[in-house]
Amino acid sequence: MSLKQLPTESMPREKLLQRGPQSLSDAELLAIFLRTGTQGMNVLALADLLLRDFGSLRALFCASKEQFCRHKGLGEAKFVQLQAVLEMTQRYLAETLKRGDALTSPQQTKLYLSSVLRDRQREAFYILFLDNQHRVIRDEILFEGTIDAASVYPREVVKRALHHNAAAVILAHNHPSGVAEPSQADRRITDRLRDALGLVEIRVLDHFVVGDGEVVSFAERGWI
C-alpha cells in the first residue's frame, strides 16, 4: 500500500500534529526522519524493516556508518543527518542540566549521564564539577579503560576540581556489560575519592553507575 492510500489521520506527520509525538510508534517516528521510501516500499514499511533488521531504535542509532549505509534506502547523507540529530539531543540534555541545580533534578541528571555514557564500549569515568549552589561548572571524562582503584587517580581528580574551583562533584561511570549494579571496587574508589576531596573541602554529592536501561545512585542507596 502506498502511504498516500492511508487515511490522513494515520499518516505519521499528520498524526504527530494532531496527537503529539508520544502517540507515534518507533516505526512512525523513524518514517518521519527518513521522509521517503524506496522503489516498491513506502517509508513506513522501510522504517519497520529497518527496526526489525537492527532490532531497536537504539541499535540503529549506535550503528557505524558502514552498518547504516549497507541497508537499501540509507546512505551517507541520512547517516550524517542522524548523527546531527543525536548530537543536538545530547546538547539539549547537557544545556538543561547546566542551567539548573543538578540535585533538584536527579532524573534529568540520570538521563543526561545515560546519554553520555551508556553506549560506550569501554568504561569511562566522568565528573560533573559544581559550584557552591550545586550548578554545573564543567563536565569531563577523566579516565577510560577498566575503572578500579588502580586506574582512577584521586590526585588527578583533586587537581581538576581545584582547577575548576569546584565546591562539590558528582561522579559517574558506565558498565559496558550493561549491568549497573556497583561493584566492591566501585565502592572502594568512591570512598578514596571522597576522602581525598574532603581534605580540600570539596564534597562528593553522588556517584552514578550507568548500565543498559538503569542508572544506580550511591546517594539513593545511602552509600554517600
From Swiss-Prot:
Alphabetic keyword roster: Hydrolase, Metal-binding, Metalloprotease, Protease, Zinc
Any single Pfam family the record assigns to this protein: UPF0758_N
Residues noted as binding Zn(2+) in the record, renumbered to the chain: H173, H175, D186
Sections of the chain in a coiled coil: none
Highest taxon, organism lineage: Bacteria
Domain MPN, first and last residues per copy: 102-224
GO molecular function: metal ion binding; metallopeptidase activity
Record motif JAMM motif, residues: 173-186
Disordered, as annotated region: 1-20
PROSITE patterns in the cross-refs: MPN (PS50249), UPF0758 (PS01302)
GO biological process terms held by the UniProt record: proteolysis
PANTHER family xref list: DNA REPAIR PROTEIN RADC, UPF0758 PROTEIN YEES-RELATED
Protein name: UPF0758 protein VC_0217
Organism placement in taxonomy: Bacteria, Pseudomonadati, Pseudomonadota, Gammaproteobacteria, Vibrionales
